[in-house]
């Protein structure tokens, strides 16, 4: 009877929220979710891609809530860099601790219209600076012109830390390698999604969620 009372009064077991489980893969991509989940959705992304920003705004949080948080699916972000602005933002986001990647990733895509407008309106002399010198020189110039130092500063990254990452191949080379690997496989547009290694025709949030609804078992 005493055991029954203890059992009755015990708190129910807490289910784990797997969106707090972020890891970095051997190739430098970022993975969120249950490491034992059988299903994996991969997104090949560019930070200067309008459809990528639309997916982040319209479907990413719902996808994480329904499939990642519950442990049913893992979600991986790989880069398919399109230009020096994209490379600079990707390097900056990779400069953060692994646990902060998806927060900053989402923030940069959701605010894309603001900082990309600065890049689009850059003068010829500004754009010339983006092409001159070392990778560090180029990315520092872009970061200054689009306000990246301030944006990533909100995530705890100092200017000197970001500058160090711009000059560190250990930070930016995996992004370049992911891009080369994607290109070799014929992935030239973004976003491109793969579910368990099978490329999807879907690129919109609505279509991706429809595929997941029919493919991921509860």
Briefly describe each language-model feature range.
Residues 1-23, 218:
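N-terminal targeting signals for export/organelle localization
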Residues 9-10, 14, 46, 138-218:
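C-terminal cap of thioredoxin/glutaredoxin-like
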Residues 18, 22, 95-96, 165, ...:
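Functionally engaged cysteine thiol sites
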Residues 21-39:
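A short beta-strand-turn-helix
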Residues 39-43, 50-54, 217:
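N-terminal secretory signal peptides
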Residues 40, 45-48, 81, 189:
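Short pre-active-site segment immediately N-terminal to redox-active cysteine/selenocysteine motifs
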Residues 45, 54-140, 183, 215:
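Structural alpha/beta surface segment adjacent to cysteine/selenocysteine redox centers
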Residues 50, 61, 191-192:
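Proline-centered helix-kink/hinge sites
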């Amino acid at each position: 009877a005493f055991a029954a009372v203890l059992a009755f009064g015990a708190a129910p077991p807490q289910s784990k929220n797997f969106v707090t489980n972020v890891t970095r893969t051997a190739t430098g991509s970022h993975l969120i979710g249950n490491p034992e989940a059988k299903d994996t959705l991969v997104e090949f992304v560019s930070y200067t891609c309008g459809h990528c920003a639309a997916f982040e705004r319209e479907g990413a949080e719902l996808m994480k809530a329904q499939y990642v948080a519950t442990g049913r699916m893992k979600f991986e972000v790989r880069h398919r860099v399109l230009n020096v602005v994209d490379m600079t933002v990707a390097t900056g986001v990779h400069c953060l601790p692994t646990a902060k990647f998806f927060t900053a990733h989402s923030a940069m895509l959701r605010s894309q219209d603001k900082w990309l407008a600065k890049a689009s309106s850059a003068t010829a002399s500004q754009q010339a600076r983006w092409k001159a010198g070392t990778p560090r020189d180029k990315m520092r110039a872009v970061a200054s012109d689009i306000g990246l130092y301030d944006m990533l500063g909100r995530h705890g990254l100092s200017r000197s830390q970001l500058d160090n990452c711009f000059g560190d191949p250990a930070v930016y080379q995996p992004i370049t390698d992911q891009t080369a690997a994607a290109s070799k496989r014929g992935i030239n547009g973004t976003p491109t999604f793969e579910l368990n290694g099978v490329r999807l025709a879907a690129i919109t949030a609505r279509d991706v969620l429809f595929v997941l609804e029919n493919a991921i078992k509860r």
